[in-house]
Design a protein with these regions (language model features):
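Sec-dependent N-terminal signal peptides of Gram-positive bacterial secreted proteins and lipoproteins
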Residues: 2-23
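Cyclophilin-like peptidyl-prolyl cis-trans isomerases
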Residues: 20-223
Length: 223
């Protein structure tokens, strides 16, 4: 009987230890030092930070991992220029994903954390409804600018994008021509899906803050 009790206690302890282990954060990247550089590996792609502006940005989300997006200045020059300026100022560091809808988008870029804020500047909306050609379709992984909407649309709402942007989780091509797509993920789709799956309140805000540690310019690294 004593042996049985001891065995059950051991099994219980093992279960507790295993349960604790499962709560550890599993990130989607590894790092290694090469000289004075830190090389980030995400699957088969290698990235390193860039001191200059590039068309690749790394979005580091605390406890979730890294997403890397390619920007398209040839298709949305005004939007990309504005985004790059904000990245250069570390504007996005410490901001949260304030709007998360599984099967649709994850949204960030608001210093107020509730969808009401932005930067000091608004930009011209680069999309067809505003008279500007932009053939970036809102498919999975696309980055696009959030803006105020109205019915009917006004010049003020069409040109109200500032700093808030969203990443499309599942194809939403009905947004084409109405919102300014400006980039697309090249790495980190598992992070996108992980964020999209969190529990939210009735306003689509995650119950626990999902914080951006930083957004930085990177470039591909070749060994």
């Amino acid at each position: 009987m004593k042996k049985f009790i001891k065995m059950m206690l051991c099994l219980g302890l093992m279960f507790i230890l295993c349960s604790c282990g499962s709560d550890e954060v599993e990130l989607n990247y590894t790092t290694k030092k090469v000289g004075d550089k830190t090389v980030y590996t995400i699957k088969t792609k290698l990235y390193v930070a860039s001191s200059e502006e590039t068309n690749l940005v790394m979005i580091n989300v605390k406890d979730y991992g890294i997403m890397v997006a390619e920007l398209y200045p040839d298709k949305a020059p005004i939007t990309v220029e504005n985004f790059k300026k904000l990245v250069s100022k570390n504007f996005y560091s410490g901001l949260i994903f304030h709007r998360v809808i599984n099967g649709f988008v994850i949204q960030t870029g608001d210093p107020n954390g509730d969808g009401t804020g932005g930067s000091e500047k608004t930009i011209k909306g680069e999309f067809e409804a505003n008279g500007i050609k932009n053939n970036i379709s809102h498919v999975r992984g696309v980055l696009s600018m959030a803006r105020r909407g109205s019915n009917p649309e006004t010049e003020a709402t069409l040109n109200s994008a500032s700093s808030q942007f969203y990443i499309v989780q599942e194809d939403a091509t009905y947004l084409d021509g109405k919102y300014a797509g400006f980039g697309k993920l090249v790495s980190g789709y598992n992070v996108l899906d992980k964020i999209a799956s969190v529990k939210t309140n009735m306003n689509d805000k995650p119950l626990t803050d999902i914080v951006i540690e930083n957004v930085r310019f990177v470039k591909y690294y070749e060994e």
